Every structure is written in C-alpha cells, then in structure tokens.
Amino acid sequence: MEKNLRYKLHKVKKQWVAIGVTTVTLSFLAGGQVVAADTNNNDGTSVQVNKMVPSDPKFDAQAQNGQLAQAMFKAANQADQTATSQVSPATDGRVDNQVTPAANQPAANVANQDVANPATDAGALNRQSAADTSTDGKAVPQTSDQPGHLETVDGKTYYVDANGQRLKNYSMVIDGKTYYFDGQTGEAQTDLPKTGQANQDNVPDSYQANNQAYSNEASSFETVDNYLTADSWYRPRKILKNGQSWQASSEGDLRPILMTWWPDAATKAAYANFWAKEGLISGSYRQNSANLDAATQNIQSAIEKKIASEGNTNWLRDKMSQFVKSQNQWSIASENETVYPNQDHMQGGALLFSNSKDTEHANSDWRLLNRNPTFQTGKQKYFTTNYAGYELLLANDVDNSNPVVQAEQLNHLHYLMNWGDIVMGDKDANFDGVRVDAVDNVNADLLQIQRDYYKAKYGTDQNEKNAIDHLSILEAWSGNDNDYVKDQNNFSLSIDNDQRSGMLKAFGYASAYRGNLSNLATAGLKNRSANPDSDPVPNYVFIRAHDSEVQTRIAKIIREKLGKTNADGLTNLTLDDLNKAFDIYNQDMNATDKVYYPNNLPMAYAWMLQNKDTVTRVYYGDMYTDNGQYMATKTPFYNAIETLLKGRIKYVAGGQAVSYKQDWSSGILTSVRYGKGANSASDAGNTETRNSGMALLINNRPNFRAYRNLTLNMGAAHKSQAYRPLLLSTKDGIATYLNDSDVDSRQYKYTDSQGNLSFSASELQSVANAQVSGMIQVWVPVGAADNQDVRTSPSTQATKDGNIYHQSDALDSQVIYEGFSNFQAFAQSPDQYTNAVIAKNGDLFKSWGITQFEMAPQYVSSEDGTFLDSVILNGYAFSDRYDLAMSKNNKYGSKQDLANAIKGLQSAGIKVLSDLVPNQLYNLPGKEVVTATRVNQYGQAKSGATINKTPYVANTRSYGDYQEQYGGKFLDDLQKLYPRLFSTKQISTGKPIDPSVKITNWSAKYFNGSNILGRGAKYVLSEGNKYLNLADGKLFLPTVLNNTYGQPQVSANGFISKNGGIHYLDKNGQEVKNRFKEISGSWYYFDSDGKMATGKTKIGNDTYLFMPNGKQLKEGVWYDGKKAYYYDDNGRTWTNKGFVEFRVDGQDKWRYFNGDGTIAIGLVSLDNRTLYFDAYGYQVKGQTVTINGKSYTFDADQGDLVQTDNANPAPQGQAGWKLLGDNQWGYRKDGQLLTGEQTIDGQKVFFQDNGVQVKGGTATDASGVLRFYDRDQGHQVGKGWYSTSDDNWVYVNESGQVLTGLQTIDGQTVYFDDKGIQAKGKAVWDENGNLRYFDADSGNMLRDRWKNVDGNWYYFNRNGLATRW
C-alpha cells in the first residue's frame, strides 16, 4: 500500500484543526486472514484496479475459521463498489505517489510493495466469532454471506471468493492449514519458506565478484559522514571496459552504487525501466521478472560502452540524478509536503533534529523550542492573545537556546552595529539602531542580550536621547509581545498590531467589506476616546510593510488570475509569475474600488501621522511602486502622504481628543490635536500653540452624505482663529495645501469665541476615486511659518525608573521609514542600486520628517529559490550573515554603496537601523547526516510520517566564508568591555551565554532543524533497518558491495532450518542477524540469533507483525477478533489519538486512532457522538448501515448518527447513556430516564423533563440559579463567555451563575434576556420603558450615535437611552 500524508482542516468537536491526510491502499487482516489490493505490476507501469473498499461490510454473526473475512470480501467486491483508478508507476514502496485502492491482496506478501524499510504481516492469531465482539471500537456483526472456496485446476490450488474471483497475493488459514496464494497467478504455495536450497538470486557470477567494492574503506566510496546515499558512487574491483572485458579499476574509476545494488526489488525494476526508456536496453520489467538480473547486467554493459564513447561519466551522473529524483523514496513525495492552504510550515514541511548514537556529531543538549516572549520559560506567561509564535520558521533554524549560539549572536550583533568600523575602517558608516526580525520565532533570550548590549555600549537606559539615538524596534506580531516588552523595561518598540489590523479593516478593504471606523478609537494599545491621557507600552504602527499586505495580495492574484490555485506566494513561484501579478496589481492600484491593492492609504496615513503615543512607520511601497527601479515611479498617493509628513512637522503636537460622530447611515471619525504646549482643550498655550494643532475628519464609505452639522472643539488656544485645509478629498482625488500660500482665503474656516470649529452637513460628504474612497479632511491653523517645526528633541536628563523607552513628545516626534520593498527591480546600472539612490536623497527624507531609516537587510542572498526571499534576493535568505555586500554586490549595491548610504542619511540627521535576522541560515554548502523527524512549525511530530528519527542529509555545514573570519572573533574583547553580559543568566536556559566555543563554522549541532529539502525519506541508503555505513565499528555494506574477494566460496545460502527455527544465509554465506531483509520482493526480520520472526515482534521501540511464513504486514489492518490494528508503511502502529484522513481510491476517508495502536471499527461513541467505522476502520458517512437487523443512518457531513429504528441504540461501554434522537442523549437509571440536575462521573449535568440532556443551553437548578451547560459535553461551566447550541452567547460569573439584564463586563455595557442570551444587533426596552440598542458585532450598548430601528431613527445619548429625531 502506498501512502502520501498530507494535512487539511477538519472539523472536530466544532473546532477546525489540522489533521494528517494519507493517500493509501489498504490491506486488512481479520481473524488470521489478510486482505489487500493487487494494484500494480511492480515495475513502474500502470494498471487498472477495481475499487474494493467496502462501504457496508457484511459479517456472519456465527462466522468461524475465516468466514468473517470471507464474508467481508464478498461485500468488498459488490458490483456497486467497482470503479477504476489509474495507478501511477511504482517507484518507492515505502512512500509513493500512487493512489492504489484497498482490495483482496494480502499484505502478508509484500512482493508487490516496494518498500525500503518493511512493514509487518500476521503472526498466529486467535480468532473470535463476530458475535462475541463488542461494538465499542470493534467490528459489528451483520448479516451473513456465503464464503468462498478452494478449487483445484490442473493440479494447482486456488481460492475463489463468493464472486468467483481468484484471490491473489493473499494468505489465510483454512481448517488449520496456512495457505498463501501467489500475487501473480493466485496459485497456492507452501506456507513456510523452503530451506536447505540456495536461492536463485545467490548464484555467483562475474558481475557479482567484480562489482564488489575495491575495498571496504571510505576511500572507495562517496559518502556523507560515512553514510552512503542514493547519489553515492564507489570504486568497484573491476570495470567492464567498453562493455566487453573486466579490467582492474583505477582510483578515478567510480560508478553509481545504484548500478550494482538497489534497496529493494521494485527499485531495481524501476532502474531497469528507466534505462529502457533511455534506450540502453529494451523491454519492461517487474520486480519478480526472471530476466531482471540479466537486464541490469545489460544496462551495465551498455553504460560502460557509452562511457568509453563519451570519454567521461558526466552524462551518467546527470542521468543517475534524474533516476534518483524520479523515485518517491528519494524525493519530496516521501517527505509529507503540505501545500496551500494547508501548509504546516512556510516551506511545505519542517524537520526537527534529535540526538542519536548514529549521528553523534549533530547531538545537542539544548534545542528548547518555542521559547518566544510568551513561553520564554517553557510555560505561558502572557494571555492577551492565543497566538504566540512558533519555532521553525524557515531554512536551517538556528538553536538560539544554546548558550554557545547565544554568545555567537552577541558577536554578530556587535559586528553588525560596528560594521563600518570593522569592515570599512570608517566609524561614520556604523549603524545606529536595529530592527529585530521574526521575534515570535526566536528564543526571547536574544532580546535580553540585545537590550543589555545596548545598555552597556550606548547607555540606552541612562537618558532618552541615548535610547532614541539607538532605537530598537521589534517585528513582534503577537499581542503578548507588548506585555513582554513592558516587563523587560520597555527596551524596544513593539507593534500595535490590533491598531494595524483595525486600520486594514476600516481603510484597506474593498468598500463592501470595510469595518466600522468607530473601532479605531479604541483598538490596540491605547483607548484614544475614553482614556486619552494613558501611556501605553512604547510602540510603532504601520498599515503595510515589505512582507505584510503585499506578498499575500500578490499571491492572491497568482491564484485567481494566473490559475495557480495552490500558490501561497512564498514557494514554487518564479519571477515571471511575479511580473505578471504586478501588472495586475499596479493596474488595480489605479482603480476606484480596489480588489487586490489596499484602498485608502492616504486615509490611513492621515490617521496614523496625527495620533499621539505611537510612532508611525512609513512604508516605501506606499510612496513608490513596490516593483520597478528604486524610487523611479511614484504611487498616486505620494503627494498626499508627503503633505501629511511635512504637515506633521509643522502642526502635530499637544494633547489629542478622538471621537466618532454617528450620522444616519455611517459616521465620522474625528481627531483634534490641540497644539504644542496644550495637553487639553482648556490649555491656553502660547503663540506656538496657536500656530499648531490639527483637525482630522474621516469617513470610509464611498457614498456617505452627512445629515447634520458637526462641531469640533479645537481648544482654548484657538479661539476666534482661522483654519485652512491641509488635505481635502475631492471628486478628482486629494487636494493638498502644505503652506498658507497654497490656499485661497475663501477656503478658510473660523473658530468661534470658544474655539469651536463647525462644519455644515453639506461640507461632509464622500467621494470615490483612485486615491480615496470616503472622505478625508485635514485642517490646520492659519499663521504658521513655512519652516515651523513643533517636534520635540529627546531629553538628556537621567532616566530614573529603569525603563528605556517612555511615551513622550520626543518619542512621538519620531517617524520611521522602511526604505525598501521586497519586490523592487534588480538594478540595471550601478546608479540604480538602492543604496546608491539612498545616498543621494538624505535631504528629501529629512524634509519628510524621517528620523529613523530602516534599511533592507544587507546580507548577500542565497539564490536557491526555495522561498520567496531567495527568489527576489531581498536579503532575508542568506548563507553567511557576516557577508554584507562583501563577497559580491547584494541586491542593494556594493559595500561602498552601503557605507555611502549610511553616511548620507546620518549627515542629514537621520539615524540608520540595521536589520538583525537571527533565526535562519539558507543552503549552507556542506552536507551533514542528521537524525530528523518530520514535524510542523511548532516541532510537533507528523503522524504517520516516514521521516521519524531517520538519518537525513541536511545542508548544515558552512566553510570558507566570512563566518570563518568573524565568527566569535569579538567575544574576548566584549568580555573585557562588558563582563556582565557574560554572567547574566538567561531566562530560558538558566545559564549565561557561553563564549568558550567560537562558531567559525556552522553545523547541525547548532540548529533546531531545517525545512524539508526534497531528498526523500530514504536518501540515506539502508538495507532493511540497517543503514549503509563505513564508519569504524559501524561498517555495514550489502552483500553485493561488500569486498569478500579471495575469501572461501560459500557452500550454501538462502533459508535454512536451524535450532528449531528458520534462518537465512546471504550470498556470502553470512547469516543475517538483527535486521530486516528483503528476499524475492518480501520483507523478513531475523533476530539477534538469526531466527526468522513471526507474529508480533518488538524491534527497538516499535512492534511489528509478521505472518507465519515470516512475511511482513505493512500499510494494513490486523483484526485479532477483538481489536483492529493499523500498521503503516513502516510496519508500525500509530499511538497518536484522534482522526486521521486517508486518501483511498480518490476519496477522502477517515479513521479514528485510539492512542494504543488500535483503530475504531463498528459502532462507536466518541465525545457523545455515535459514529460507525467499517471493517477497515473507515468512517461511514451518508449511508445507512444494518447491524443485527437494525438500521442506522449516518449523516454525510460529519458522519453522526441521525436516524435509527432501535429505541435504545447507545454504544456499549456507555453505562446508562441512551441516544434519544439526533444527538440527543439521556441517562437511564433503574429503568427510568433521569431529569433535572445530576452529577454523573463527577460532572454536573442537567436533563429536561423529557430526559434529554441540556447541551449548549441554560437551565435553572433546584436553588433557582440559572446555569449554563456547554455544547460539547453538557457539563456545567465556570466563569466566562460561552456559545450556545444556536450560536448565541451567555456570560457566567464567578459563582457559576448565568447573568441576565443590563451588565457591565470588561468595560462594555451589555444586555442578557431572562434566559441569559446576549442581545446583539437588537433594541431592548428595559423595565423603566427606556429603549437601548446593542451592537450586532460586540454587543456593546450604543452611545452618542444615531440608529435606525424598525424604520425609525433614534439618537442614543451618552447613557445609551434613545430619543427620537
């Protein structure tokens, strides 16, 4: 059976979870009989197969001696189940792309299954009649069928099933005798291997003797860490010169391992067929073809002739590489790759490295995963959001929990901050500050190390100026990161991600999907309407970034417009894809209602740039197009954003008042800044105050028209003052007026004697064009000088509270510019390089008010193309993090261009931020064998994955680079300068960083893992369970390679009888011990004494299953009469618990694993759901099943029982629980259904008067208290919000009581009816006759807004009470 494990979302207990999905062909062993599918020709050719997975297996209630299985086979072959499926060529038996359906072929003989590491067959099994089996997790007996029978034709015996078909590749016990029916002919064979005879494969010949290795030393082989791989070549004893005569090999005469030896017969057949297609030989071959050996010898002869003709073996290396990649065991097909939209890792899959005696060079005492800010100690500390991040992000994942690595990270940070001095000999070319990349994906100890280094080197904790001059910002997406930053002395600016998300919803979406503007006033770290004087955690905010709201939108275009439906925009894409997508993207940029490009970017900047208590980061791609040459093409929004930036310098200061003015169908978000020196509306201020300040009015609906006037209090400092527009939305776009001279005085508006600035309803209306979809108005006082600057310089006064950053006017005065796009074009001439252009434009950026310039990562990019970053070469995918345009130019220019850019910006008074990327290294040049397990991004093992603590060749070694030159180089000096950095114990490890080892070369012991590389699960070659290895003390070579020349010839080989058991001698006469062995296409295991295994056998930590004839069961089901066990393609049972999806004959089918190796079959109760699983363990959906004469119908979606003709069909093992209807349960005790409040199994539950359990609803207990019972189990709950069965909401307080009436919860006023159901999107009359309205989304009571209720308009005042217009 072949299997491809994939993952998809599946609804389990009302939650969508990622579950393993496997493409399979099933074999089933029941009561001593094995059923499997005869699905391929074992030669890589396709065959047509009948679909034989029974949807409604029938069992004889009195089945004995195999009749249970026989009856099942008849059901399996019913006419309505027959369908054909094209099976792809068999290439790798352990994991293949074939979709081969289950049928009547025994997995006991795996001759038709080309595995490299075998699975298991049935041993001696105890059968039990179906009538004796329980229904909970076991097959359910049903109606009887006529069994099949033996027949003899021409002296040959066959087994014919009830449909008259001969079973092939099938073994069963009949009247106490074991039969095996040949996989090709169906002819009955002896149940045990014949002994005392030499196997035909063991006849010695000149090929066998001469193809042995020249020596068993590593010098005769190409290896990785002494392991042989599918790409390994070796030096044979002799070479068949020109395909004619054997001659002694020379040192340079290397040949592919796979020309002489193959891990199994099926691969050998595939090899022969590969060369047949190449024209070296003719014919088609199967793994049991009698002429297969002759074919491979003819191939060898033909290869040698072509080598002689070509004069080299380069062509052969190319062809052998093609062959290797065509085999699923040596390709990504066996690595459980996941694709959009169900990826479990950004590169399709991750590998976790683990310790093993077989790869001791890669062992580590660390690898503490997921120690991000939320889980730095290993336990969750912050709970603002459920998202905390994950460890395995991209490529080779650096183990940042290792103290040696942590010291290296400090070394690299020091190098990065002093790059100008170290590399260029120019201190003026040093970076000033830092952005830390992917904070949620690294060990948070690095953040403390960076913080402490900045404190020691720059004195960032000493005063505000030092801190701002050496700014630190975090790419910190989790809402928990803000809490972490606060606890760590406000050492850096974190993202106000909730505010960013709110802006996207309110501004960026297409008009039909935009959110409510009012939410922006309260979203994120600061409530700007209710608590304007609060000081949130120091933060920054943006609407877009180089990797946010660009590449995801491009990916959407690629999927929807270019027809690549599985494109995630990150992998498997080309520059041509990107160029085509950008043509569509840029066209959409100029559309009125944009589909792909974000809408209303000027509106977002108008909001961000005037907000208090946050730092705005401007994105390059909002000023200039994301693609194209650097700064060559302005966006339609350039003028508006530039005006807002320059106007910010002149006007944005003082306190802030934010409000939302609800009108008829929509509302206006307003914000007032009072001017420098005025923190509130009552502050009179001074001349500078009067000439500064700002009013902002925004609506985000394209068809908005106000129906009433609006007045803003500009503050006492602005009484009787003229105001003019800075920005106005018009039907043609956005009009900008930077200076007073740009405005016609007729456009002035005047405040009254109280400082109120009024707008008539006719002035408040939206427009729709490419620049704005809604309304933007920005007003500023008349009278400011053109060069007015109201920003505040940072203080040099000593900081005393221990915090590094503080919310202050000086911090508010900062503007960060993210000065690059992922997608800017490659320079065509030196003057087009990004850094060359930046160096010339310092004054422009200064005029915008930019104070901090965030540079692109300056590392020379890897070009391996495995991820977007290594396609567009943006600097985030690199192999050498010390190489900042030093080995060659990077995408942004030369090292001199970088130095010039830094100096040019600094000369304009702008600080320069480097990009610290501590998490990953791509495509290192050196290979290394590691012990790897296929995992998801969190490091959780993938159920059923073939790569499971398996030797794997990773690209984890570096050499000959700047890492060798600079790795660890500065640690000794740093210890002298800042000794406390080396004595501080880190939070995740409890240990200080370790400078004793200087990492000049990377290797696997310093990594947590890697992405899957497409080499395949079995790229490191093995024979059975033993890997081909040349290390001292671990030497293992297959017989055909092992140099035994000159040793005495063996007198016997093959199966032998010995000490009451069956043993096996290989071609050299050596007894096979303690390993799996493929013999004539089937797999066997011989223990440490050489005895052939039968039955259940524990090997290492896993239990396998072997037939009485020693053949192994893999990818099959064994039914022992009581329980059913699933054996995967490795022959192992699964101990995971839960649903796993299998792909069977083009259909998705589900099994349930119990956690002990068994699977559910029959009628089963799971989480109060009644489900049915057929004899193969597949869940029945959308069908009616007859069990013991009673009918059960299961729905087509989730497979729950929906109808039964049995009055009490509760599954066995559920005590008094009774199914009363569609997912309605009762509990029967002493013959009576319980009612009211009850305690069962320690849980409080409640039953209605009719006995039906309350689930997802409320009920009043005996003491008159309203309680809630959850919708899954029906258990009484504690404090919190809960969803009811009809998707309403209730709230339970600390006492377990369901709240009713008007309540205040978490600062919101909400209402619950007398059943506890929250009012949402409805008006409610309270007991005093007052009308209140509660929002449809949040349920919060409306205040200060108009609302249409049942066709009438009401105004809900500050207390939430309604008045008519």
Curated annotation (Swiss-Prot):
It comes from the Bacteria. Residues 200-1000 are annotated as: Catalytic. Gene3D superfamilies: Aspartate carbamoyltransferase regulatory subunit, C-terminal domain (2.30.30.20), Cholin Binding (2.10.270.10), Glucansucrase (3.20.20.470), glucansucrase (2.30.30.420). InterPro entries: Cell_wall/Cho-bd_repeat, Glucan-bd_rpt, Glyco_hydro70cat, Glycoside_hydrolase_SF, KxYKxGKxW. Its EC number is 2.4.1.5. It is an enzyme of class 2 (transferase). Residues 1-36 form the signal peptide. It catalyses: [(1->6)-alpha-D-glucosyl](n) + sucrose = [(1->6)-alpha-D-glucosyl](n+1) + D-fructose. One of its GO terms (molecular function) is glucosyltransferase activity. Residues 80-99, 127-152 are annotated as: Disordered. Glucan synthesis by GTF-S is independent of primer glucan unlike GTF-I. Residues 80-89, 127-146 have a biased composition (Polar residues). Keywords: Dental caries, Glycosyltransferase, Repeat, Signal, Transferase. One of its GO terms (biological process) is glucan biosynthetic process. Production of extracellular glucans, that are thought to play a key role in the development of the dental plaque because of their ability to adhere to smooth surfaces and mediate the aggregation of bacterial cells and food debris. Synthesizes water-soluble glucans (alpha 1,6-glucose). Belongs to the glycosyl hydrolase 70 family. This is Glucosyltransferase-S.
